[in-house]
């Protein structure tokens, strides 16, 4: 070439070294002139003037060493200036086991270059390669390890497809994209160390890899279809990613997967996304709009809460959930398609919220075992008019009512609902609103009876007791006026930060949020917009403001059992001297 370089274009079996090790020289002398070897020919590097070297070869076989069965090793001379290796250059060199002394100048290994070789270990760490191109190590079934280029940015399609012996991958910090089928069929790949900056995972990228764990960084914005099909993942945390859509089959048939945290901004879950993945619980973000067909078939949920913005649950989305007992449909207009909750033998209660009269048939035959359907009182008649036709019962149930069943797991718990509810029918169950009092750095509770939907509450009742509360009309009069309530309602899940503003009820006191995460639907938490006065890390005490003075409120509150002293107005006293005080929930006299 005019620049003083040359390329390797072919080989001669007759001159192949006895040991099968081919050395790519730094320079070659042609007609008395030294030329620097800069590349190894690929099938697509041919031009019209290259016909001299064609020798009747066609297609991929024109690549330099394609289909060479006698080459066993490749070695680059010291100081080699090879910067590129062409496509298919060593394709089907089925006895090629080693590559040694790879030059640091190498910046381009083209597509399908080492397809079907017998390479066992490759070190590209010191090269300048930025892309693992299409099929570059496709079906290298003997490849057990590879040290990737330190400057690598992208994996193109099928780069390591079918490398069945590959067991470990460490991603350089520069990688941003891992595209389609890159590690599909790598049936020994159990460990991948990811960086914290990649953005894209393509279709089928880890399909049928025995991966047990994956770290998903906050830079990740897309996952392709069937990306993790049939992997061994047991937990998936996507909560901090930028993903808005989980496509079809994303985590299809992940038989060990029990715990999933979805992205905060997720709007769509594709069909078969978690098919046959035995997830035990899941929290849907409030942004979710659609769950497609068979998305959670064969999951192990006990209850499901469909968020308010979700308008469509497609066919079979939650079918064959053997443990599912309760479903809350918070969507104002949520269509439940055919067999949406089919073959859920323990499903007994469906709560449907709507601010509009339901269209007959909207909830047509999504269930199959006669569950109870609970709706607002003014909608009971409309739902009950959905008659059985000759072929099916549109709701597949004969029971519609306006009752809300509530079982307390603890004596004190937080609660919220998408319904207007009446708590006045029980002596041993009380609902409270809450307000933070800066003066004494405590939380005051105020009892309420008839409560509007979307009101954060604290409940006190009998642990393990089940209460049946009337669901009131959507326009019910006489609801208790609630002012200054600082409990955030979580009809849908609410993302809570680990700040000094969010507090959760624990052991009868409010404790500061430790880690960011979802506040679960059906619960509530205390939000102090300006934070606590003293920025204390200690739990916030609670007193019941149900009498004229704070004395009886504190006295009657078994939750307050700390070692502090309070005066008769409920204010904490740092060094009590003489007089009457409240201590550990009781009146004491100091003399």
Model-assigned labels for residue ranges:
Residues 1-16, 386-388, 392-435:
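GGW-centered surface loops in extracellular recognition modules
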Residues 4, 17-39, 45-84, 94-108, ...:
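Structural signature of tandem-repeat unit edges
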Residues 381-391, 465-472, 533-541, 571-591:
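Short, surface-exposed terminal/edge motifs of secreted or surface/virion proteins that either
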Residues 435, 547-591:
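C-terminal outer-membrane/trafficking sorting elements
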Residues 395-425, 447-551:
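A short, polar beta-strand/turn micro-motif
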Residues 13-15, 355-357, 378-383, 462-466, ...:
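Acidic glycine-/aspartate-rich tracts in secreted/extracellular proteins
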Residues 364-402:
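Extracellular/surface-exposed low-complexity segments
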């Amino acid at each position: 070439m005019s620049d003083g370089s040359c390329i390797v274009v072919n080989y001669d079996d007759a001159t192949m070294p006895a040991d099968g090790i081919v050395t790519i020289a730094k320079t070659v002398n042609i007609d008395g002139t030294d030329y620097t070897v800069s590349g190894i020919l690929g099938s697509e590097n041919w031009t019209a003037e290259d016909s001299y070297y064609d020798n009747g070869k066609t297609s991929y076989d024109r690549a330099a060493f394609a289909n060479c069965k006698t080459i066993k090793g490749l070695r680059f001379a010291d100081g080699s200036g090879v910067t590129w290796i062409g496509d298919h250059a060593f394709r089907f060199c089925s006895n090629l086991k080693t590559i040694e002394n790879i030059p640091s100048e190498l910046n381009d290994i083209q597509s399908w270059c080492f397809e079907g070789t017998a390479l066992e270990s490759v070190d590209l760490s010191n090269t300048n390669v930025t892309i693992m191109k299409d099929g570059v190590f496709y079906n290298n079934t003997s490849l057990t390890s590879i040290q990737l280029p330190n400057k690598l940015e992208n994996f193109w399609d099928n780069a390591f497809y079918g490398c069945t012996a590959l067991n470990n991958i460490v991603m350089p910090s520069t990688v941003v994209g891992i595209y389609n089928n890159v590690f599909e069929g790598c049936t020994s790949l159990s460990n991948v160390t990811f960086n914290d900056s990649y953005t894209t995972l393509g279709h089928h990228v880890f399909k049928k890899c025995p991966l047990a764990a994956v770290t998903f960084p906050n830079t990740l914005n897309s996952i392709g279809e069937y990306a993790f099909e049939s992997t061994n993942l047991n937990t998936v945390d996507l909560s901090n990613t930028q993903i808005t859509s989980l496509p079809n089959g994303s985590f299809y048939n992940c038989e060990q997967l029990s715990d999933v945290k979805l992205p905060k901004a997720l709007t769509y879950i594709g069909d078969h996304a978690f098919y046959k993945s035995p997830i035990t619980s899941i929290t849907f973000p409030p942004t979710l709009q659609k769950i497609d067909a068979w998305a959670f078939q064969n999951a192990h949920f006990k209850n499901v809460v469909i968020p308010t913005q979700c308008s469509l649950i497609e066919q079979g989305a939650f079918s064959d959930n053997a443990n599912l007992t309760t479903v809350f449909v918070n969507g104002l207009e949520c269509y439940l398609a055919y067999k949406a909750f089919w073959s859920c033998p323990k499903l007994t209660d469906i709560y449907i919220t709507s601010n509009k009269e339901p269209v007959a048939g909207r909830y047509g035959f999504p269930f199959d075992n006669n569950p109870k359907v609970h709706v607002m009182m003014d909608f009971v008649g409309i739902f009950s008019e959905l008659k059985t036709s000759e072929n099916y019962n549109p709701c597949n149930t004969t029971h519609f009512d306006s009752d809300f069943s509530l079982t307390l797991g603890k004596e004190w718990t937080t609660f919220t609902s998408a319904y207007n509810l009446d708590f006045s029918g029980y002596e041993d169950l009380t609902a409270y609103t809450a307000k933070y009092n800066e003066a004494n750095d405590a939380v005051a509770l105020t009892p309420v009876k008839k409560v509007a939907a979307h009101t954060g509450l604290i409940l006190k009742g009998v642990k393990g007791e089940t209460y049946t509360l009337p669901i009131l009309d959507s326009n019910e009069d006489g609801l208790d006026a609630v002012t200054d309530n600082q409990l955030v309602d979580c009809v849908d899940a609410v993302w809570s930060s680990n700040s000094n503003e969010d507090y959760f009820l624990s052991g009868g006191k409010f404790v500061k949020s430790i880690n960011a995460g979802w506040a679960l639907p059906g619960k509530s938490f205390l939000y102090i917009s300006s934070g606590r006065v003293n920025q204390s890390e200690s739990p916030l005490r609670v007193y019941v403001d149900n009498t004229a003075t704070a004395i009886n409120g504190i006295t009657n509150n078994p939750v307050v059992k700390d070692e502090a002293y309070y005066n008769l107005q409920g204010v904490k006293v740092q060094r009590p001297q003489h007089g009457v005080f409240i201590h550990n929930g009781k009146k004491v006299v100091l003399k």
